[in-house]
């Protein structure tokens, strides 16, 4: 009984060894594996077992050359050859790699499947074990965040379109009682694109609603501000002296009402005063103090407390003028920032007051947003994380590619 148990364990180990090595030299991984491609160029495709056992996943299975050779000799795939001295292995020359054409890439894409619903602490081995009876799998890509955390979703490449279709069309698939979302890779990206479009539409709608709400708040605030100033405007007009200025008005009403704003320019024949309190009261106090004859630079003046629509329009103009004045003041304050001591601007060529920022503009891929991969491994300018599949190389020479070691 013990012998049977040992035989079963050895058979299971040999199967894992074959699977791992045949993955390394397989159609999907080998074209992407820079390190392994360099090795097979050195000796007619032969790679020393001494090199192979430095690959982490194989290393965890065994470092015994005899066990590896025995396992490969029993493989039904007949993908690998063993050297006469049993110290090297290579992919059989009779089984060359497929040419990576557009047709080939489309074929790979058509047998690629998206699966979501795994726990984020699931390992590559957990997922491989779950997929064992689901058809022959050539590659597993564990999708990860920028911080290398597993998202709970994977891309799987099956050996044939038929296998992929059978898997996708199998209803009610679960992982440990958790329902899984299963789609062809193309369907997944089509779904994501549709979601993005919908998100953009919703974002525009939200932005419009927020803008309308903001505008309403501003209008309400403006109306409240107007209401608070109702009855506070005093218009003056007449044949005013050309030297009449706002200071004259401040002096005239200094003890009778606090002035908040004066809409008047020197040389004009009329203007408007905005008081903090009611204009009628300030006007009455000023007249009483001047025996009813309220003049400006000895010129007769007509005084009128504004009401109704005329008052509202005048208030709106004053509020706009106040805001414009505030903006100019802020802008002027910004211009003075960054100058040297004594508010003197840095002299040209001095290098003082200058700050230059240099560097690259970095763009980060967001969650679930940038997984449209070229099936031959080309990724453009974006480097891919090495954790996403079960490909690996010797730890000392690990390449940072998309389909790097799953859980080193």
Swiss-Prot record:
SUPFAM superfamilies: RNA-binding domain, RBD (SSF54928), Winged helix' DNA-binding domain (SSF46785)
Comp. bias intervals (Basic residues): 329-342
Positions of the xRRM domain: 227-348
Pfam families for this protein: La, RRM_1, RRM_3
Gene3D superfamilies xref list: 3.30.70.330, Winged helix-like DNA-binding domain superfamily/Winged helix DNA-binding domain
Ranges of residues in domain HTH La-type RNA-binding: 7-99
InterPro entries assigned to the protein according to its UniProt record, in alphabetical order: La_dom_prot, La_HTH, La_xRRM, Lupus_La, Nucleotide-bd_a/b_plait_sf, RBD_domain_sf, RRM_dom, WH-like_DNA-bd_sf
Biased composition (Basic and acidic residues): 384-395
Chain positions with Phosphoserine modification: 92, 94, 225, 366
Domain RRM intervals: 111-187
Location of N6-acetyllysine modifications: 116, 128, 328, 341, 360
GO BP annotations, alphabetical order: histone mRNA metabolic process; IRES-dependent viral translational initiation; nuclear histone mRNA catabolic process; positive regulation of translation; protein localization to cytoplasmic stress granule; tRNA 3'-end processing; tRNA 5'-leader removal; tRNA export from nucleus
Region (Disordered): 329-408
RNA-binding is among the record's keywords: yes
UniProt-listed PROSITE patterns: HTH_LA, RRM, XRRM
PANTHER family hit by this protein: LUPUS LA PROTEIN, LUPUS LA PROTEIN-RELATED
Task performed by this protein: Binds to the 3' poly(U) terminus of nascent RNA polymerase III transcripts, protecting them from exonuclease digestion and facilitating their folding and maturation. In case of Coxsackievirus B3 infection, binds to the viral internal ribosome entry site (IRES) and stimulates the IRES-mediated translation.
Quaternary state and interactors: Interacts with DDX15. May interact with RUFY1.
Extra remark: Sera from patients with systemic lupus erythematosus (SLE) often contain antibodies that react with the normal cellular La protein as if this antigen was foreign.
Protein name, per record: Lupus La protein
Biological source species: Homo sapiens (Human)
